[in-house]
Amino acid sequence: MVWVRDLVKVHRTGATATSAIHHVDLEVRRGEFVAVSGPSGAGKSTLLHLLGGLDRPDGGQIWLDGRRVDGLSEARWAMLRRRSIGVVFQFFNLISNMTVADNVELPALLVGVPPRQARARREELLAELGLESKARSTPAELSGGEQQRVALARALVNDPDLLLADEPTGNLDSRNTRDVLRLLSRVHEQGRTILLVTHDARVASAADRVISLFDGAIAGDTEVSLPASRRGSVADVLQLKD
């Protein structure tokens, strides 16, 4: 599903160059749930942005579903994200003058999903995330945690083959974290591929694998040892309390 070789990204500020991603090799199999962990500044968000076409690499190759994509135009990347890749941004990126309902439905409408079908899918996702009463609210009327859940619903509305999520539980309390991870668990069980950035070891333990980044390089790649039956129940894995 995801195949990366010798990936390099350098951030430049004036005459200063900082290696954000340093010759990374990575393979994520179709249907895997992979967590990416590491300290702040390790390159986690940069890696996700590169895999989603939101930033350009300075070297290496990115292949998605057997197709090389690192050289795609912005327009082709945008189409790929609409149809096949869901992205949950760390800072939400919701459209401020649109309601929650419109924010979630928009990606579906852009790829030609009939309005009635887009609305039904939106209602399903908002209900799963405890947001059905917020459908007519604007982002400014929501808490940070509510905005985060809306961003997740928007990323999932087109049932993407690949979900890239940057700290999707970062602003959530235990109850809402559990709701989000239950939804991610269901998405995973449907065969979707998930790559999730997190600082939380409990959240990472819900994944099949945990990749550790340090100074832009992979410092570890570990299979989660919990039995599949326990990984399938996020509430059990994380033992989250209300």
Language model features with spans:
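ABC family nucleotide-binding domain
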Residues: 1-207, 213
